[in-house]
Structures are given as structure tokens and as C-alpha cells.
């Protein structure tokens, strides 16, 4: 019997789940919005909300705990510098999950996960910067 077993397996091994959630959390912090399946969205929400709470603590131990989960120093610095200061007065509820229909190929339920007061220019900012740099290089 499966009594008291919290969380979804998502048809993956434990190490695959851990790596997938670390990558999804890093993408969500970087772009401030991701599109994924509904079960993955429901699983990633408490992970990222706990990371934002770590960012609000702001001490060295909290930063090291965040790095142990995300494993990307640039993402952790954005979490602690930008996102934690944005939600300094909010107690939880940093993320929103919106249902986004069904995927064409396998009819899986899709969802959009985003920060509540997100920066609308954060999504695709790296691509926009890369394209602008390429255009300047071509023009020069």
C-alpha cells in the first residue's frame, strides 16, 4: 500500500527527478515563466517557493543551500539579488500556475508557471541580447 508517500514519481528515477526539478527551477528563475505539463508544474511550485524563501533569508548558509539544489551560481545570484528583494514583503505565494490547454502530440495537460509580479521582459532577454549583439556585429 502507498500510504504516506508524498510527491509524484513522474515515471522517472529519483536522480532524474532531482536533476529535472533543478533544471526547471533554474529555468523558471532565469526566465520567470515556463510552460510545462500540469503535474510537473504542481511539483515544481513548492521547490521554487522554498528557494525564494531561502533568498529572502539572504545569508551565506542560505546561499549555499540554494546552490546545492540549483547548481548554477548565476541563477542563484539572480534569485538572491533580484527575486528575493522583489518579494521581501510577501509571505509565500510567489508563483502562479495557469492551465494552458492540452499538448498536440499526446494530449497532456499543459500549464504556465510564472512569478506573481514577474518582469515581463525577463522571458527571452538572453535571446534578445544575443540577436542585438549579432546585428551590431553584422552592421560593423
Curated annotation (Swiss-Prot):
It comes from the Bacteria. The keyword Ribosomal protein applies. The keyword Ribonucleoprotein applies. InterPro entries: Ribosomal_bL17, Ribosomal_bL17_CS, Ribosomal_bL17_sf. GO terms for molecular function: structural constituent of ribosome. GO terms for biological process: translation. Gene3D superfamilies: Ribosomal protein L17. Keywords: Ribonucleoprotein, Ribosomal protein. GO terms for cellular component: cytosolic large ribosomal subunit. NCBIfam families: L17 (TIGR00059). Belongs to the bacterial ribosomal protein bL17 family. Part of the 50S ribosomal subunit. Contacts protein L32. HAMAP family: Ribosomal_bL17. This is Large ribosomal subunit protein bL17. The gene is rplQ.
Amino acid at each position: 500500500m502507498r500510504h504516506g508517500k508524498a510527491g509524484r514519481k513522474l515515471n522517472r528515477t529519483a536522480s532524474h527527478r532531482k536533476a529535472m526539478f533543478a533544471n526547471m527551477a533554474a529555468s523558471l528563475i532565469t526566465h520567470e515563466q515556463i510552460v510545462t505539463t500540469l503535474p510537473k508544474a504542481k511539483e515544481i511550485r513548492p521547490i521554487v517557493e522554498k528557494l525564494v524563501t531561502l533568498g529572502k533569508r539572504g545569508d551565506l548558509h542560505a546561499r549555499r543551500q540554494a546552490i546545492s539544489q540549483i547548481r548554477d551560481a548565476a541563477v542563484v545570484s539572480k534569485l538572491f539579488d533580484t527575486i528575493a528583494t522583489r518579494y521581501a514583503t510577501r509571505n509565500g505565494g510567489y508563483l502562479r500556475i495557469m492551465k494552458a490547454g492540452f499538448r498536440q502530440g499526446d494530449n497532456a495537460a499543459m500549464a504556465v508557471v510564472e512569478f506573481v509580479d514577474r518582469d515581463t521582459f525577463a522571458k527571452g532577454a538572453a535571446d534578445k541580447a544575443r540577436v542585438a549583439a549579432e546585428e551590431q556585429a553584422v552592421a560593423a
